[in-house]
Amino acid sequence: MPFYFRKECPLNSGYLRKNRPEKPDGRRAVLRSQVLELHGISHGSAGARSIATMATRRGYQMGRWLAGRLMKELGLVSCQQPTHRYKRGGHEHVAIPNYLERQFAVTEPNQVWCGDVTYIWTGKRWAYLAVVLDLFARKPVGWAMSFSPDSRLTMKALEMAWETRGKPVGVMFQAIKAVIIRAGSSGSYCGDTGSGRV
């Protein structure tokens, strides 16, 4: 027959202190809400140091270590947008002459178009947007997006502008320096479409 013993002595006070439920800490709850709010305001880009600085400016005493612990408790992580770098081409592009000479006062539509390419972070990678503007209307007349900033992107935007404006003849297209366009491909396109000089 088994014999069971139960120890009838008081438990260690350290054991009791460790296992008792914690009292809700009002100050910590306020700081947690501040961390959550500030992380949201920064669209997830602020880290512990930035959050601590912003909270201190708001009047809440917080160091970066406390901010880091609160971020960890809330499951928040700083996500930084990567910096953009154009890849270097293998060869130098031919300089495109500037026929416009900063004469932006255009008297009629479809006389002068200008274009540029910019980059946009899409959440996973960089996308490139090429835009063609009519200098008379001061509005976009053609655009195109791509994941690679090559001459095809600029050509698509130029084709869209040419189609939407009724295939005009004699239009001068001036590319801003950031536009990635190769002289051979743009020249042949302008020759085919009659869009004028590049």
From Swiss-Prot:
Residue ranges occupied by any Integrase catalytic domain in the UniProt entry: 105-198
Q: Which GO terms describe its molecular function?
A: DNA binding
> Which SUPFAM superfamilies does this one have?
Ribonuclease H-like
Q: Does the keyword DNA-binding feature in the UniProt annotation? A: yes
* A biological process term (GO) from this entry: DNA recombination
Keywords attached to this Swiss-Prot or TrEMBL record, sorted alphabetically, are: DNA recombination, DNA-binding, Transposable element, Transposition
**Record bears the keyword Hydrolase:** no
Q: What does this protein do?
A: Involved in the transposition of the insertion sequence IS911B.
| PANTHER family in UniProt | TRANSPOSASE INSF FOR INSERTION SEQUENCE IS3B-RELATED, TRANSPOSASE INSO FOR INSERTION SEQUENCE ELEMENT IS911B-RELATED
Q: What protein am I looking at? A: Putative transposase InsO for insertion sequence element IS911B
Per the UniProt record, the source organism is Escherichia coli (strain K12)
